[in-house]
Amino acid sequence: MIVTSSIKRYAFINAKLKTRLSLVLGDEVFIRLIKSQNLGEAMLLLKETSFASVEAVYARTGDLKMSELELMRAEMALYQEIHRFGDKDLQEFVNALLMQYEIENFKNVFRLWFDRWIRKRDISYASGYILREPVLYTYDKDAVLAAGEDSLLLESLKGTAFVDVVKNNMDEIRTAQTLFPLEMALDLLFYNNLLRQCQKLTDKDRDIVLRLVGVEIDLENITRIIRFKLFYQFSPLQMQKYIIAGGHRLKPDKLFALYSSSGEAELLPALLGSGYGSVSALASQSQTDIYKRMEMVESILEEILKREVKKLLLGDPFSIGIMMSYFIIKKHDIHRLISILNGKNYGLPEDRMKS
Amino acid sequence: MMFTSNMIYLTAVVLKKDSDAVTKALLQLGVLDFVRVSELSGGNDARIRSVQASVSSARIIENKRRIEMTMGSGSSGVFQEVLPTLDDLQDLNLDDIEKKLAEIASRSQEIKEEQRLIQQEILKFEDIIRQLSMYGSSKSITAQGLRKSSEYSFLTIQTGTMPSAFVSQFENDLKVYPSVSMITGTSQDRSSMLVISLKKDEKQILQLLDASGWIQGEIPMASSPDQNVKENALSDIQNQIRILKEQQSSLHNQYQAFIDDRLEWFQTSWSLLRSNELFYRIQSFFSATDRTVLFSGWLPAEFKTSLEAVLYQAAQKRCFLEWHEPGEITAETKGRVAVPVQLKNPGFLKPFEMLVKNFSLPEYGSIDPTPFVAVFYLMMFGFMFGDSGHGLVLVLLGFLGKFVFRKSSDSSKKLSVLIIYCGLSAVVTGALFGSYFGYPLFPPLWFNYHAIIAGHSSEYTGIQSIYDILLITIYFGIAVLGTGLLLNWINLIRKGNWMKLLFDKAGIVGGWMYGAGVYTGFYFVRHLYKALPGQTFLLIGFGIPSLLLLGKEPVLLILERKGGHKEQKISIIFFLNMLMEWIVELLEVFSGYLANTLSFMRVAGLGIAHVSLMIAFFQMAHMADGPGGESSVWSYLILLAGNILVIALEGLSAGIQSLRLNYYEFFSKYFNGSGRAYSPVSIRTRL
């Protein structure tokens, strides 16, 4: 019975997604994008790919940020399409995944609000780059931007999950003039909601999602911890406030212990050694430049995720694994694409874009 | 046409000073599929070395791609390849091309930057619209209300009066800022005005207003009590956005015109790059000694004389050419250097050649299955899709495809022709079955398929039931498999593989058992499933070939010993292996052939489904008829939708199933798809 329902649930969706995987941009396209002479040429390369709409927006407006907005729409459309084909439980889970875009867009809106009301900057044209169509919550983004007082701001967010998060962080935003705690709290909101929704899945699907989301959380925590150590010199207690629970191999107490006991140089090998021994050898490559070290960390973490995704793609074809893999691969593709296009726009050298 | 083209191998030595002329001659004739000399010798001859190209091929290809991409962004939307000629092969200055491309890219970016700036203006205006939209209902708001509400928005709204004579100049100066100005009334020589702009531009706007004799003040209520300021402002902004979008679109057109104006340069440069790319590709296969250049490769034997002539001419007879038969090369290189395969079929068979290549290329020297595929594919398709009307639609769609894809790739054109052929086949079988869009417009030339499925008389005594239709397809399957076996035997005889010819599942022993199986099957059915042929027949038909199969391993062993190969020990394991292999092979022969033959019943299955669907749609249309039994619009619509659905669904199914039967039932009997495609370097080679 369980077998029948999982076939019913995933046969069509996964067959569709497996076909779509052939449209994923290969490494060859990325290399050509990196090697293109300027942004215009890079965009022309996209004309023959599944990202043709992005090129069309650029050809019409000449505006990279408008193309990025199109990419975000394309990315969300993937989830919305699966949402249409899924049953109720799957739809709820897809909504939990879609939450990341709602949060991402809210962060963009709130950064503009912050620029306007706290930093007193002009945001007139920048406000054109936020996504106004509703993702999960229907709220008026312009009302948020226009809200100079806290009460108006909270009123404009009524009905969303953001009200409490904003309310809890408002004092720090105004006094410390930083969005850092708010953004961290929003990330926590996403992961907590996702882990909660996981509980409604079948045992097999839950195991897959917990593993994959757990790996993502591990990677997110590793990135944060390294940044805290290298750039912010946070104390272990400060660090602990921003750690996400639910990691696959790196639990908060282990992270705390490693953060407390390791110096800058030993932290990454120690973190990887505790959870991801198979790639820890990569971390031994010495890099003195702090940014190069971060790039190296990110590429190692990317490699870890790739390995997990590869395992899932070769696994059960009637499970949530294919869908999760597809989302991760596409997300990775889109983010890499955005980085390269921005790199081209700002004339970054090729080696900076390879990372 | 029956077999793959005969190939011949050339090894040539020319003087270094003649190498460019020889390269051009090779490029022009374009028949040589190059093999590096080092591959022949195994790569360990220290006297010869590779020829280093003076220009980087990667750089040539990169620039060529850039041109293709940029040309594709012109008004045509795609890069259209025009084959280069030898005249295009001039000295190449990559620096010049790169410089020109950089100039074009730079100008393109300038245009894009202008578009981007306009986009930002549009965004600002759109922002003003959003801000204005927040000020209550569009019908009730007045200038005063608007002004009062602006304190929380990004907008600044000024109300006051200015001398009427200055209005025109002020409005002109205001155009550089995203803004709206409206005259709300005139009194004597002063105009009452409302100016909406972004807060960040407030300072500059105030300066402009001051310079125009502006007196700040409320708009007199009396002059505009019901004036819908918001509506007017929105309309004005929409208009400005429209103008900006037109400017943006005009810049896009300007960009395309900029690209189109340079098409001639693009085309010339592309041809120059392409011809040089091919020239250096040929030379990359060359090996050299101090004074000579060596090259080698395959060509169809029919071109031997013409290649010889052009090489002698290019090298002014200062060259040495050595020709080898394929067998010599494969033996000498122990199969390292594979003989390429060229299928040579007349143009009308090319769509079927595409189907064969899609599966794989046949082994060199074996039968080219294209003509057989053409016949069987069309017969199967016709039987599954037997309706003249539907066939005619496919013919029309095929011609439409040919027109639409006239500038596209070869495969799209071939697919269109294949659809035309399939349509024609359906037209013929439709006439045989008397079916025209499901209607029996004319009497069937063979039997009435629809009548059989509907349980009526077929108008032909030989075929009266669905079982008769299934039987036709089984006969057809036996014919296809029999042809496959025959082709396999021809291939094996040509290769001199006598062991396989005798003992293989698709060899003589296999065919012998299949023939006996077919006879036994029909005998069994004819005797109402109660009797088998006599014991003598069963012994000859199955017993002897089975015993021969058992003898395969010992015969192989004897031959190996005679051939001086490593001896396999005769032990109990050997006999157990032999026995196991024998049992497995027997099972494969019996179950495999049975499954292969019955697989052809799908031809009848699809045909029955086609007719059944049409009958179902006719019944549905009948149910939608009017009260007096006259046809209604709905019944016509149902018939139209039904026909479209059947053409689309059944057309696709029949096409796929015909392909499947060819690939998995027919090909599995004789086709060895290990061929490597013949791929000569020619100035006429398309991308």
Give, region by region, the residue ranges found by the protein language model:
Chain A
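N-terminal domain-start signal
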Residues: 1-355
